[in-house]
UniProtKB/Swiss-Prot annotation:
Protein name: RNA-directed RNA polymerase VP2
Species the sequence originates in: Aquareovirus A (isolate Chum salmon/Japan/CSRV/1981) (AQRV-A)
Keyword Transferase (UniProt): yes
Lineage of the species this protein comes from: Viruses, Riboviria, Orthornavirae, Duplornaviricota, Resentoviricetes
Enzyme class: transferase
Function: RNA-directed RNA polymerase that is involved in transcription and genome replication. Following infection, it catalyzes the synthesis of fully conservative plus strands. After core assembly, which consists in recruitment of one capped plus-strand for each genomic segments and polymerase complexes, the polymerase switches mode and catalyzes the synthesis of complementary minus-strands.
Length: 1240
C-alpha cells in the first residue's frame, strides 16, 4: 500500500542537475527551532497551546525542533516517531510535560499529513512532466509553456533548503508522510529538524505545480516564495500565512484598473424573470470607458502596511508594477489576477481541537439593543410570544418566522406521512452523531439499548443509533435532548480549523420544525442559493451578473455567525414565532411520531391554563429548552492525552440539519428590514434613499448561510456614487451591531460569493482552494485504502479542468499522477502479499483523456470528454476508421459478422491494446465490500426490522407501501417481462442503510485482499466485449459539421485562463458561452419527484418512471410503484399524469439509459449544445437507418446526448453534430434498449 514506512526515492538529487537562474535567499531563522515546551501550558489540568510572543489566536503548530522527543523506527533508523516513554507517560501516567510533548508531536504530524500523498511524489510528477518538452500537437494555437524548472524560484528554494538536510551525499526529507501521520528525520547531534520546514516544502511544491500549470511568471512565483519564507521564519507558520492571506487579493482582484487608460470589453448580462429560476441572458457587450472604472480605491496601502511588518514591501511593489501593465480589462489582465490569487498558500490548517473549542465556543456577541422584557407575553411552556410593543428588526424577524410557520402548518403536504418520513430520515447517514453522549443520557434514565454489533454496521454512525432508538417512544427519549454533543473537526484551506457539533438523533428530531420553517422562508420570501463544495453546484452566472457594470456589488459576510445566533436575540423570538404560527394547526396532531402534549399557558396572568399543543409545537417546546440551556460540548481531544472535558456553550450547533437553512433565513430577513425600513429612516443622502426605494431582497440580496451579496442596481447608465456607497456600508455595519451581528462588508468592484470570484463578468478561478498537493485529513490517525488514491488523482484532474489550468500540461501532469496511483499492494498479517495494477484504459474510462493513441495526432481528445461509457464511445468513434483499417490488415476476418465492426476483428485488436481489460477493471468497486459471512444473520435481521419500524412507524405510510408493493408484484406477475424487473421501494431502504453503515466501518483485511484480487482479475480478463449499453451506442455514427456559431465575443474575457494560450478551454467557452442558469435549478426542473427519503435516489426514481413510460406502463402500474415509495393516491395520480415523454427534458430521457451531463460541462451552456447543435438525423434527406417511429421519439434525446458527447470530446471549436447513420437501424436500437430497461 502507498504509505508504508519506506523512504521516498531521492527525488531531491534530480534538483542537483538543474542550473537555477533566480536568486532565492533562505533566512537562517527558518532553521532555528524555538523550545517546544514554551508553547504549551496546563490550565485546569487541560493542555493548552500558548504563545510566549503574545500573538492572538496563534494556536497552530509552532516552529520547534522535534528531534528531542523522537525514537528511531526499526525499519528506517534515520526516522522516528514519538518516544514510547513519552507516549506512555502521557497516556497512562498523565505527566504534564509528557502530555505537552505528545500534543506537540501529534499536532506537527497531523499538519504534515494534510496532503494527498507524500509531497515529494508531486515534485517527482512535476520533474518527470517537465523533463522533456511537450509533444507538439501540430495546431497553430498550441503554444509551448515558457515555465522551466531552472527558472522556478520555488524549486530553487526547495533545493537550497534541502542542503541543510543532506548527510553523506544523501538527502533526508524533514518528514515522510505515511498513512497514520508522519515520521520525522532524526538529525545527527548539532543539527535540528524544525517542523515548519516540512510545511514550507509542501507549500513550495504546491506553488511549483501551480506555476507550471498556469504559465506563471517567475517574478510572481518569487513573490509567493518570499512570503512563504517570511512566514516560516516566524514562530508560527500557519498563523503568519493566515495573517498575510489578504495581501494577494488586495494587490490584484481588489485593486485592478485603478490607474492608466481604462478600457476593454465585458459582457452585458440580464437576470430574467422569474428571478427564482436563476436564469440569465448574455445580451451583448459593454465597451468599458472611464465612467465605468472601479469606484473604490485600490487596496495597495492596506497590503503595504501588512507587508512592511514582515519586510515584504518590495514584494508588493513587484506585483503593483506588473499590475500597471494591465490597465484594460482583457484576457491577459484576468489571467494576471488568477495568477496572483494562486500564490496564496493552499495548506489545510490544523489546530488543536481543544483550542478550536475554547476559541470558537466561548464567543458572546455584543448586542447593543437587547429585547426589552416588556415585549414578551407571559410564558407558554418553555417559550414566550412577542406582544404589540415589539418593533424594529427583531419584530420584523418574528413576523417573518410567524407567517412562514402559519403557511407551513396550513399546507396539507407538511402533514403527509411521506414528508414526515423524508424529514426524519435526512439525518440517518453513515456519519457519526454524539452516540456515546446519547448512550450516557439513557443509562442515567435506566434505559438499555439493544445491541446490533453482530451486523458489522459502524457503531458510531447515525444508522446504528437510529436502529437502537427505533422501538422507544419519544417520551422515553426526552432526557437525551439535553444530552451532550461530541467533538468533530474540519480542517480548511485559508481558514482556521473549525470544530463541529454532530447532534444526536433526538436533538435533530426536535430541530425539524426549525428546518421546515426556514426552508419555507428561503423558498418563498428570500432569494437564497444552495451551497455545494463543487464550483458547479453554485450559481456561477449570478456572480458574473453581479460583477458587470453599471451594477455595483457589496460582498457581505456575518462574522462568527454560529456564535451570533444567540437565544436572547434570535432563537427565543424564532421559537416563539414558530410556536405561535403552529397555533393555526390541529393541536391534537402528532408530527414525526412526536405526540401532542399539554403546556401551561400564562399569557393572561389572571387566568393561566393548561392547553393542548400539537406534535410540531411539542418539538418546538423542547427545542426552545435546548437552545435556552445551551449545549454541553463533550471534548475528548485526540491530540492531547487527558484533555477530556465538558464545555458549556450558547453557540448555535454547526452539526444541526437546520444550521445552514436557518442562517440563510435570518440573513435574508434582516437584510429585508435593512433595505425597506432602516436605510430610508437613517440615510442622510437623498440619492441613496432614491436608489434603495426600488431595492428588495428578491432582486438585490442573495444569501447562503453567513454569506451575502448586495447587488446595487444602476441608475440608467450611471452607477451609485462613492459617497452613497460608503454611507450604505456604514449603515449596514451600524445596523448589525444593534442585534449582535458583526457584518464583514467589502466592496471592491469585484463580486465574491461562496468563495467564488468574478471581475467585470469574468470568473476568476480560485486555484489556491484546490491545492494539487493538499488534502484534508480531519482525524489525526487515519489510513487510506489504496484505490482511493485513484479517486484522489481523478478529483485533482477535474479540479484543474474547472480552474482552466493549461490543459495539455495539466493532462500530462495528471497522467504522471495516474501512473503512480495505478499500482497498489496489500500485506495481510498472514498469507502472501496481494498486488493490483490498473491498466491505462482504466483511467481513460474514469475520464482522463489519452494524450496519444495509435494512428492519431497528439492531444486530440478534449479534457471535456465525459467519463464512463460516454467517453469510451466518443474515443472509439473518432478512432473507428483506424481500428477498422488496422484490424482488417493485421487480423484474419471474423467468421460471423459483428453488428458494429462487420468482418473486421476489431474486438481482438481492442483486446490486444488492453482496452477491454482497463474498461472492466475500472468498474470494480474501489471500496472493500464487507463479506456477508462477516455478519450475524439474526443481528442483521433484527436491525433491519428496527430500521423498518423507524421508517414505517406511521400506519398510513406503512399501509401505502405494503399496498403499493403488493399491487406491483401482482401486476408484474400478470405481465412478466413487460416492465423493469427491479424498482426502488421504501421496503429496500433498511437494507440500503445497513449496507451503507457496514461500508462506513473500517474494512477487514480479508475484504481489502478480496477487492485487490477482483481488480487484478478484471485487469487480466480475456473478455472481448463492452457493456450492453456501450455495444448499442457503438451502432451510432456521428458526423461533425461546421463549428457552431460563436455564443460570445471571443475578445471578451469570460473565464481567467480560458484564452488563446489555453486553446481548448477558450474554444469551448466562446463556442457555447458560460452557463446561463443555476445548475441545481436546471436539474431540479428535470425531475418529476422532487424529494424522497434518505437511502433512495430521486434520479433513480425519475429514471424508473420514464423507463416505465417508454415500456408502455398503465396508470395502475405507476400508482403501484409510487405507492411503494410512500406516495399518497392523490400525489401518485398527479405525478403519473405529469409523466409525458414529449414534455420530458433531454437530459431526463438520456438518464434512462445512464447518459448524463458531466460536471466539466456545467460551467458552459450545455443545454444549448444539446438542444440546438446536436441533431438525431440530418435535415432533408436522411439515412433511412436514422428514421424513428413516432412512439419511439424518446430515442432522439439519447442520440442528441451521444452527438454532444462526440462534439465535446474533440479538441478545438465545438462543431455541430449529427447522427449520419445507425448500424442495423435506430428502431433495432430502440428494441434493444427497451429490453435492457426491463432487465435493469
Amino acid at each position: 500500500m502507498p504509505g508504508t514506512y519506506a523512504p521516498v526515492p531521492n527525488v531531491y538529487h534530480l534538483l542537483d542537475h538543474l542550473t537555477f537562474r533566480s536568486s532565492v535567499v533562505i533566512p537562517n531563522s527558518n532553521f532555528v527551532g524555538r523550545i517546544w515546551s514554551d508553547y504549551w501550558a496546563l490550565q485546569d489540568n487541560i493542555v493548552i497551546r500558548v504563545s510566549p510572543e503574545g500573538a492572538k489566536d496563534a494556536d497552530y503548530c509552532h516552529n520547534s525542533n522535534i528531534s528531542p522527543i523522537l525514537s528511531p523506527l526499526k525499519t528506517i533508523t534515520e526516522y522516528g516517531t514519538l518516544h514510547p516513554t513519552i507516549d506512555k507517560d502521557a497516556s497512562e501516567r498523565g505527566y504534564p510535560s509528557a502530555r505537552m510533548a505528545s500534543s506537540f508531536f501529534k499536532l506537527a504530524s497531523c499538519q504534515a499529513r494534510q496532503v494527498k500523498i507524500d509531497p515529494t511524489r508531486f515534485l517527482e510528477f512535476l520533474l518527470v512532466t517537465a523533463s522533456s518538452p511537450r509533444v507538439p500537437s501540430g495546431v497553430d494555437s498550441d503554444q509551448p509553456n515558457p515555465w522551466l524548472p531552472e527558472t522556478s524560484p520555488a524549486l530553487q528554494a526547495i533545493w537550497q533548503i534541502m542542503q541543510r538536510y543532506k548527510l553523506n551525499g544523501n538527502y533526508y526529507a524533514p518528514a515522510l508522510v505515511v498513512n497514520t501521520g508522519a515520521v520525522w528525520w532524526i538529525p545527527p547531534p548539532g543539527r535540528t529538524n524544525c517542523v515548519t520546514v516540512q510545511f514550507l516544502i509542501t507549500d513550495l511544491i504546491n506553488l511549483a505545480v501551480n506555476a507550471f500549470a498556469t504559465r506563471l511568471a517567475p517574478e510572481l512565483e518569487m513573490c509567493a516564495v518570499r512570503v512563504y519564507l517570511a512566514a516560516a521564519s516566524t514562530p508560527n507558520y500557519a498563523h503568519a500565512l493566515l495573517d498575510l492571506k489578504s495581501i494577494f487579493p488586495n494587490l490584484s482582484l481588489h485593486s485592478m484598473y485603478r490607474e492608466g487608460e481604462f478600457g476593454g470589453k465585458c459582457p452585458r448580462i440580464e437576470w430574467t424573470e422569474p428571478r427564482s429560476s436563476y436564469r440569465f441572458k448574455w445580451i451583448g457587450v459593454t465597451q468599458l470607458y472611464e465612467g465605468l472604472r472601479p469606484l473604490t480605491p485600490s487596496r495597495d496601502s492596506k497590503a503595504l502596511l501588512k507587508m512592511r511588518d514582515s519586510g515584504l514591501e518590495d514584494v508588493a511593489k513587484v506585483i503593483i508594477t506588473m499590475r500597471r501593465d494591465h490597465p484594460r480589462h482583457t484576457s491577459d489582465s484576468v489571467r494576471f489576477v488568477r495568477g496572483v490569487l494562486s500564490l496564496i498558500s493552499g495548506m489545510y490548517l490544523v489546530r488543536p481541537p481543544t483550542m478550536s473549542v475554547l476559541r470558537e465556543y466561548s464567543q458572546t456577541p455584543q448586542i447593543e439593543e437587547p429585547i426589552p422584557p416588556d415585549w414578551w407575553t407571559g410564558a407558554v411552556g418553555n417559550l414566550s410570544y412577542f406582544n404589540d410593543k415589539a418593533k424594529g428588526p427583531l419584530a420584523h424577524l418574528y413576523s417573518v418566522w410567524l407567517e412562514a410557520a402559519r403557511q407551513v402548518v396550513m399546507d396539507p403536504s407538511t402533514h403527509d406521512p411521506l414528508t414526515q418520513a423524508i424529514y426524519k430520515t435526512q439525518f440517518v447517514t453513515p456519519r457519526g452523531g454524539s452516540s456515546a453522549a446519547l448512550k450516557q443520557a439513557l443509562v442515567e434514565s435506566k434505559v438499555e439499548l439493544p445491541d446490533f454489533s453482530g451486523t458489522g454496521v459502524k457503531r458510531s454512525s447515525k444508522i446504528y443509533q437510529t436502529a437502537q432508538l427505533a422501538h422507544f417512544s419519544f417520551q422515553t427519549l426526552i432526557p437525551t435532548i439535553m444530552g451532550q454533543v461530541t467533538l468533530g473537526i474540519r480542517n480548511q484551506v485559508q481558514r482556521r480549523a473549525r470544530s463541529i457539533m454532530p447532534m444526536s438523533n433526538p436533538q435533530q428530531t426536535v430541530s425539524v420544525p426549525h428546518t421546515l420553517v426556514a426552508n419555507y422562508i428561503n423558498k418563498h420570501m428570500n432569494r437564497s442559493t444552495t451551497s455545494g463544495s463543487a464550483v458547479q453546484d453554485k450559481v456561477i452566472p449570478l456572480l458574473l451578473y453581479a460583477s458587470t457594470p453599471p451594477r455595483t456589488v457589496i460582498n457581505v459576510d456575518i462574522k462568527a455567525c454560529d456564535a451570533s445566533i444567540t437565544y436572547a436575540a434570535f432563537l427565543a423570538p424564532i421559537c416563539g414565532a414558530m410556536h405561535q404560527g403552529f397555533d393555526l394547526g390541529d393541536p391534537s396532531l402528532p408530527f414525526m411520531n412526536v405526540p401532542s402534549s399539554t403546556q401551561y399557558d400564562r399569557r393572561n396572568p389572571a387566568a393561566p391554563y393548561n392547553r393542548p399543543v400539537s406534535g410540531l409545537q411539542t418539538m418546538t417546546q423542547h427545542l426552545a429548552r435546548l437552545y435556552q440551556a445551551g449545549f454541553s460540548y463533550k471534548v475528548d481531544d485526540p491530540f492531547s492525552s487527558g484533555n477530556s472535558f465538558v464545555f458549556p456553550t450558547t453557540t448555535f450547533p454547526s452539526g444541526s440539519t437546520a444550521t445552514s437553512t436557518e442562517h440563510t433565513a435570518n440573513n435574508g430577513a434582516m437584510a429585508d428590514f435593512f433595505l425597506r425600513e432602516y436605510v430610508p429612516q437613517h440615510a442622510k443622502s437623498s440619492t441613496l434613499k432614491f436608489i434603495v426605494k426600488d431595492m428588495n431582497i428578491q432582486n438585490n440580496y442573495v444569501c447562503q448561510g453567513d454569506d451575502g451579496m448586495l447587488i446595487i442596481p444602476d441608475l440608467g447608465t450611471k452607477r451609485i456614487s462613492p459617497e452613497d456607497l460608503a454611507e450604505l456600508m456604514e449603515l449596514l455595519e451600524k445596523y448589525g451591531r444593534g442585534f449582535g451581528w458583526v457584518y464583514d462588508i467589502d466592496s471592491s468592484d469585484s463580486a465574491e460569493y461562496l468563495k467564488l470570484y468574478a471581475l467585470f463578468g469574468a470568473r476568476i478561478p480560485n486555484i489556491s482552494r484546490h491545492p494539487p498537493v493538499g488534502k484534508e485529513y480531519a482525524s489525526p490517525e487515519t489510513g487510506e485504502i489504496w484505490p482511493s488514491l485513484v479517486n484522489i488523482a481523478m478529483g485533482s484532474f477535474y479540479n484543474g479542468v474547472t480552474d482552466c489550468l493549461e490543459w495539455r500540461d495539466w493532462l500530462k501532469f495528471s497522467w504522471a499522477f495516474a501512473c503512480f496511483a495505478s499500482r497498489g499492494s496489500f500485506h495481510p498479517k498472514t498469507g502472501p502479499r496481494v498486488d493490483a495494477q490498473y491498466p491505462v484504459w482504466s483511467f481513460i474510462y474514469m475520464g482522463l483523456p489519452p494524450i496519444l493513441l495509435p494512428g492519431q495526432t497528439p492531444f486530440l481528445t478534449s479534457v471535456y470528454m465525459p467519463a464512463g461509457d460516454q467517453g469510451i464511445f466518443a474515443i472509439l468513434h473518432q478512432w473507428r476508421d483506424y481500428l477498422t483499417a488496422r484490424a482488417t490488415s493485421d487480423y484474419p476476418p471474423l467468421k460471423r459478422r459483428h453488428p458494429v465492426w462487420h468482418l473486421a476483428d476489431v474486438p481482438s485488436l481492442l483486446s490486444d491494446l488492453g482496452v477491454y481489460r482497463g474498461y472492466w477493471a475500472a468498474q470494480v468497486s474501489r471500496r472493500p465490500e464487507p463479506s456477508p459471512d462477516d455478519a450475524d444473520p439474526a443481528s442483521v435481521e433484527a436491525m433491519s426490522a428496527a430500521l423498518s419500524t423507524y421508517l414505517l412507524k406511521d400506519p398510513v405510510l406503512r399501509d401505502r407501501v405494503v399496498r403499493g408493493t403488493n399491487a406491483w408484484r401482482r401486476l408484474t406477475d400478470t405481465h412478466p417481462g413487460r416492465l423493469p424487473s427491479r424498482v426502488p421501494s421504501l421496503l429496500d431502504v433498511p437494507t440500503r442503510w445497513i449496507k451503507a453503515g457496514r461500508d462506513a466501518d473500517k474494512p477487514r483485511p480479508s475484504a481489502v485482499a478480496m477487492m485487490m484480487k477482483d481488480i487484478q482479475r478484471a485487469a487480466s480478463s480475456s473478455r472481448k466485449d463492452f457493456s450492453r449499453l456501450l455495444e448499442l451506442y457503438l451502432h451510432v455514427h456521428v458526423h461533425l459539421g461546421p463549428p457552431v456559431p460563436l455564443a460570445v465575443d471571443p475578445e471578451v474575457p469570460h473565464v481567467a485562463g480560458a484564452d488563446i494560450l489555453n486553446d481548448d478551454h477558450w474554444y469551448k467557452v466562446t463556442s457555447l458561452g458560460p452557463i446561463a442558469q443555476s445548475t441545481k435549478k436546471y436539474f431540479d426542473a428535470t425531475l418529476f419527484v422532487g424529494k424522497t427519503v434518505s437511502g433512495l435516489d430521486v434520479e433513480a426514481v425519475d429514471a424508473t418512471l420514464l423507463r416505465m413510460s417508454i415500456l408502455g406502463a398503465e396508470p395502475e402500474e405507476y400508482h403501484a410503484f409510487l405507492a411503494g415509495i410512500g406516495m399518497s393516491d392523490a400525489e401518485a395520480h398527479r405525478i403519473a399524469s405529469a409523466i409525458s415523454l414529449a414534455d420530458a427534458q433531454i437530459v431526463q430521457l438520456a438518464r434512462t439509459v445512464n447518459l448524463a451531463v458531466p460536471s466539466s460541462w456545467m460551467s458552459l451552456d450545455f443545454d444549448t449544445l444539446i438542444r440546438s447543435h446536436s441533431y438525431p438525423r440530418q435535415p432533408g434527406i436522411s439515412d433511412s437507418s436514422t428514421l424513428v417511429r413516432e412512439r419511439a421519439s424518446w430515442i432522439n434525446s439519447v442520440l442528441r446526448l451521444l452527438c454532444a458527447t462526440v462534439a465535446m470530446s474533440r479538441v478545438g471549436p465545438v462543431c455541430q453534430a449529427t447522427v449520419s447513420s445507425v448500424d442495423g437501424g435506430v428502431n433495432q436500437i430502440v428494441g434493444c434498449l427497451r429490453a435492457w430497461m426491463r432487465d435493469v
